[in-house]
Amino acid sequence: MRLLRASAVMTTLLLLLAACSDSGSGGEMLSELGEPEGELNLVIWAGYAEDGSAYPEFDWVTPFEDETGCQVNATVQADSATGVQMLQSGEYDGGSFSGNATDRLMAGGDVAPVNVDLLENYDAVFDGLKNQPHNSLDGVPYGVPHGRGPNLLAWNTDEVDAQTSQSGLWEDAANYEGQLSLFDSPDFIADASLHLMATQPDLGITNPYQLNQDQFDAAIALLEEQFTHNPQFWDGNTFADQITQFAAGDITIGTTWQYQVNSLLAESAPIDSVKPEEGATGWSDTWMISSQAAHPNCMYLWMDHMMSAEANGQATVYFGEAPTSQAACDYAESIAPGHCEQTHATDEAYWDDIWYWSTAREDCADDDDATTCVDYDGWVEAWTTLRGS
């Protein structure tokens, strides 16, 4: 028996679609929806489109397909840069993207603005997730929220004392030679600069993603020192390997997501985690529709589905993210008691010191023409050099 059942909202929306003419294009904001096209091609983060094949109790794809007739074809992106390239290929109707991709997609015209009046579940989304820099442009929504979470610090409680700050990754890294676990992405440079915000305030860093040359050089120097201690790496495709490494005792401390922590706790592994007192980087992911979408009606139906209590509740429990509405929280609690408290879904103050992934820009993402920052190409080049050293 499937855990999830199609909602009355979805049924109502489909009836409305049948009464409307085919929109025919995903290039501009839609004024109305037409008949579902029968197919939906998505770029996703791993775990964002589960059909019950991995765990029968987690299935929000099959009910969507049964109710709408839109057959979901999902392709996993390894990282945000790959996701951007995939959507730009024109082969996908949309996808789930983090802030370090959404700003590029909006700026490049690769995604279309979203008519949220056509999405019945949008009104219920927490206000703190709406009209944010990572999902809106000039006050116009370019997507709908999926979930959010911090990049946590985790450690093996048998080997490491309780942590409150990131110092274990930086100043104390020599204590964990060969057993550090780090996120393998240029975006990890922001974790270094966030630590410098707290420990070297004279650098004047005010945004860990927008760094002038001196600030950037300081972050790279910190990483160069850290890399001398032979860290191990994981990314959006290999986070399961981090679970295995923690469970086996091959790593003792590192950055992680709630998903890995929950998986390890379920195995009774000696693991604990914290949002460091300096704050943390993190993500707030968004479902967006391609400006070249071949199946825009199915994409709109999917975006609305992913804000429903059942689908969002399941998806955020599955990945250890904060649900996007009170209704989704209530559903999440019914299948995973304590989930919304654990993920701070309704505690907006918790997110005040979480810096969602964003793209480094030459103009420093501000209105001061006198400031110049190292752009993302510079971050990629530096990270490639670091990883090759």
Language model region names:
Residues 43-56, 96-245:
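Extracytoplasmic ligand-binding site segments that recognize negatively charged/polar headgroups
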Residues 15-19:
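C-terminal motif of bacterial Sec signal peptides marking the signal peptidase cleavage site
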Residues 20, 27-105:
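Early extracytoplasmic/lumenal segment of secretory-pathway proteins
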Residues 351-389:
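Conserved C-terminal helix/tail region of periplasmic/extracytoplasmic solute-binding proteins
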Residues 101-106, 254-270:
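A ligand-binding cleft/hinge motif common to bilobed small-molecule-binding domains
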Residues 93-97, 235, 252-257, 272-273:
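Paired acidic/hydrophobic, glycine-rich loop segments that form the ligand-binding mouth/hinge
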Residues 120-125, 149, 220-226, 267-291:
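Periplasmic-binding protein-like
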Residues 285, 290-357:
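Mature extracytoplasmic/periplasmic domains
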